[in-house]
């Protein structure tokens, strides 16, 4: 009996991909808090936008809440962790008023944007925030300043329609996970309309967002399908889908697990692009590769632009706790 040969497939695996330093740090903070203080450790909002990560932490004893008033009175001696996206100033103030011990897992690069926005405000500038309405990072950044101090711009059309109170006294910052190209277009339009618009001291879009978009741009041309591993509420993952399509992939999709793959829809392909958003764990990337290997004679080739070496320290209270490979195996494999 002849067994049909598997069709050949080239998988262009992008590097860098997956966890950035800020996401890695945030997950480590929850894991170390559980080791240090025991379960439950409460986390306000999803620590990162990935259900696999959230469920893995829940299995270890983390409890996710949307607001601090959801924490039972009998557990108020337990720590609460703020997510990597950052929070408005009112949240730590609320924690203090409730006598809660909190650990802030805000990405240091998001904290930098907060400081840039506050500096604009301190110098008397109205802050223009380029970002997506409703995203936790945008809510957190806007919440650093008094109400009315920030105007949100999402698109070039918004930039065209924006009418400031004082056009000569504006400063901008951006969400860290935006499309690099789209954001450049919005900034250019704002600068065209408001020549005195003050830029932040450093680019607000983070290194990981930029790096992941650049390698997807390089790998996408000629791909029959480009898969981005990530959650539907992950801003940076959704931007990667858009980047792949613009760069020449015939089709690009966002998936969270291999079980979501629709093989009838995928059909006959010969070249697959594969990357992962900054909150997607490597174990899922491997899961996707193995799913394709089960159906194709797959050859993986690495498409790499840069190697990332960034590393952010966890909170001082947790630095004496040992973090082992076993502690992080649920996301790293």
UniProtKB/Swiss-Prot annotation:
EC number(s)?
1.17.7.4
Which keywords does the record carry?
4Fe-4S, Iron, Iron-sulfur, Isoprene biosynthesis, Metal-binding, Oxidoreductase
> Does the record carry Transferase as a key word?
no
Q: Where does dimethylallyl diphosphate bind?
A: 49, 85, 135, 234-236, 279
Tell me the disulfide pairings in this chain: none
Q: Which domain of life is it from?
A: Bacteria
Record text on cofactor binding: Binds 1 [4Fe-4S] cluster per subunit.
Write down the Pfam families for this protein, in alphabetical order: LYTB (PF02401)
Instruction: Name the positions where (2E)-4-hydroxy-3-methylbut-2-enyl diphosphate binds.
Output: 49, 85, 135, 176, 234-236, 279
One MF annotation (Gene Ontology) recorded for this entry: 4 iron, 4 sulfur cluster binding
Q: Which residues form the active site?
A: 137
This enzyme catalyses: isopentenyl diphosphate + 2 oxidized [2Fe-2S]-[ferredoxin] + H2O = (2E)-4-hydroxy-3-methylbut-2-enyl diphosphate + 2 reduced [2Fe-2S]-[ferredoxin] + 2 H(+); dimethylallyl diphosphate + 2 oxidized [2Fe-2S]-[ferredoxin] + H2O = (2E)-4-hydroxy-3-methylbut-2-enyl diphosphate + 2 reduced [2Fe-2S]-[ferredoxin] + 2 H(+)
- Which of this chain's residues are annotated to bind isopentenyl diphosphate? 49, 85, 135, 234-236, 279
Q: In which pathway does it act?
A: Isoprenoid biosynthesis; dimethylallyl diphosphate biosynthesis; dimethylallyl diphosphate from (2E)-4-hydroxy-3-methylbutenyl diphosphate: step 1/1; Isoprenoid biosynthesis; isopentenyl diphosphate biosynthesis via DXP pathway; isopentenyl diphosphate from 1-deoxy-D-xylulose 5-phosphate: step 6/6
- What are the binding positions for [4Fe-4S] cluster in this chain? 20, 107, 206
Regarding protein family, the annotation reads: Belongs to the IspH family.
Task: Report the PANTHER family cross-referenced here.
Answer: 4-HYDROXY-3-METHYLBUT-2-ENYL DIPHOSPHATE REDUCTASE
Task: Return the protein name.
Answer: 4-hydroxy-3-methylbut-2-enyl diphosphate reductase
Tell me what organism the protein belongs to. Answer: Rhizobium leguminosarum bv. trifolii (strain WSM2304)
């Amino acid at each position: 009996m002849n067994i049909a040969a598997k069709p050949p497939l080239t998988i262009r695996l992008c590097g860098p991909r997956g966890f950035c330093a800020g996401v890695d740090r945030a997950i480590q903070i929850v894991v170390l808090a559980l080791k240090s203080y025991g379960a439950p450790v409460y986390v306000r909002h999803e620590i990162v936008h990935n259900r696999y990560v959230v469920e893995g932490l829940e299995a270890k004893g983390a409890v996710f809440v949307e607001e601090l008033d959801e924490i039972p009175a009998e557990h108020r001696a337990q720590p609460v962790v703020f997510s990597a996206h950052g929070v408005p100033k009112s949240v730590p103030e609320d924690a203090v008023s409730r006598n809660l011990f909190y650990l802030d897992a805000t990405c240091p690069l998001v904290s930098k944007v907060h400081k840039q926005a506050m500096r604009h405000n301190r110098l008397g500038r109205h802050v223009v925030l380029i970002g997506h309405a409703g995203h936790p990072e945008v809510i957190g950044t806007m919440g650093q300043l008094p109400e009315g101090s920030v105007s949100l711009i999402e698109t070039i059309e918004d930039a065209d329609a924006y009418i400031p109170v004082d056009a000569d006294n504006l400063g901008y910052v951006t969400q860290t996970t935006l499309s690099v190209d789209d954001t450049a277009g919005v900034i250019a339009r704002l600068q065209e309309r408001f020549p005195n618009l003050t830029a932040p001291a450093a680019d607000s879009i983070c290194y990981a967002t930029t790096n992941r978009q650049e390698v997807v741009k390089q790998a996408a041309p000629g791909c029959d399908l480009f898969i981005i591993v990530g959650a539907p509420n992950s801003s940076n993952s959704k931007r990667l889908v858009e980047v792949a399509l613009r760069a020449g992939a015939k089709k690009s999709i966002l998936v969270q697990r291999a079980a979501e793959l629709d093989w009838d829809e995928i059909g006959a392909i010969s070249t697959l692009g594969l990357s992962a958003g900054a909150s997607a764990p490597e174990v899922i990337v491997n899961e996707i590769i193995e799913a394709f290997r089960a159906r194709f004679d797959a050859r993986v080739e690495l498409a790499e632009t840069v190697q990332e070496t960034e590393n952010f320290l966890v909170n001082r209270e947790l630095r004496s706790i040992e973090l082992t490979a076993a502690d992080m195996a649920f996301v790293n494999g």
